[in-house]
Curated annotation (Swiss-Prot):
Location of this chain's protein in the cell: Secreted
UniProt entry tagged with the keyword NADP: no
Protein's recorded name: Putative cysteine-rich repeat secretory protein 36
Stretches assigned to coiled coil: none
Extent of the signal sequence: 1-28
Domain of life: Eukaryota
Organism lineage: Eukaryota, Viridiplantae, Streptophyta, Embryophyta, Tracheophyta
CC annotations in GO: extracellular region
Keywords carried by this UniProt record: Repeat, Secreted, Signal
CDD domains for the chain: Gnk2-like (cd23509)
Record organism: Arabidopsis thaliana (Mouse-ear cress)
Length: 251
């Protein structure tokens, strides 16, 4: 009787522990993939309902949804002539191509319509990135304006200078990998830091020519804003970088 009771008690404890672990994993995934930031491009003005601009916008949104399979996680589509010209740039994180990217598409679309209702131009960042604009910038131009940073509130406990140098060097190595012709402007990896692992990724929009220049600038900006932080990211419309002390990419 005693051994049967002990076994049942162990099974209950194991079940509770498994559920708690699952909840933590789901919560972590939700935090990783959740809405990050948005920007309504007020300077580009607003459009009226049932206008030619709205017609062009809705056409592109529906066209991408019905035709794109996102094999490389990216699309840049335009329609119309000024003042009703619309261009959409959509890109998924480098670990979310194909069907994962396709399922991600609806989230920023609904988010941008809710947060920037009626604005001709808007940008939203979550696991996917969406940029709607009336301006078709040439791919040689890096957008240094529409950027932001986020970081863990806690600092590392170990030698901060050593941590910063190793993190910076690791991001530079990933930058060089992402800049290679067949890399798809994306690289990710992990490295050992004492008793912990450091996880990082770098990614450029597929339509910019100078990926290395953009990433190098972003790494420098990250060093200014997020010195000694346990995790941080710097995001823009041309490229983005991130590092954490826990795995955050899909496998």
């Amino acid at each position: 009787m005693h051994s049967s009771y002990s076994l049942s008690k162990c099974l209950v404890c194991f079940t509770i522990l498994a559920i708690q672990t699952l909840i933590r994993r789901v919560s972590s995934l939700n935090r990783t993939n959740a809405y990050l930031n948005h920007k309504c491009l007020v300077i580009q003005g607003k459009y009226k309902r049932q206008s030619e601009y709205e017609e062009n916008l809705n056409y592109i949104i529906d066209h991408i949804s019905s035709t794109q399979k996102f094999p490389d996680g990216f699309t840049h589509t335009s329609r119309g002539e000024a003042p009703n010209f619309v261009t959409i740039v959509f890109q998924c994180r480098g670990d979310s191509y194909g069907s994962k990217c396709r399922s991600c598409y609806a989230t920023p679309i609904s988010g941008i319509r809710r947060r920037c209702q009626g604005y001709k131009g808007a940008i939203i960042w979550d696991q996917c990135f969406l940029d709607i604009s009336t301006i078709n910038s040439p791919p040689t131009m890096i957008d240094y304006e529409n950027t932001f940073s986020m970081h863990n509130q806690n600092n590392v406990n170990e030698d901060a200078e050593s941590f910063n140098k190793k993190t910076r060097d690791f991001l530079y190595n990933l930058m060089l990998k992402a800049d290679k012709p067949k890399a798809g402007s994306y690289a990710a990896g992990e490295m050992r830091l004492g008793t912990k692992n450091l996880y990082a990724m770098v990614q450029c929009a597929l339509d910019i020519f100078e990926c290395k220049v953009c990433l190098e600038w972003s790494i420098n900006e990250l060093s200014k804003c997020c010195h000694s932080k346990k995790g941080a990211r710097f995001l823009g419309t041309s490229c983005n970088i991130r590092y954490e002390l826990y795995p955050f990419l899909s496998t």
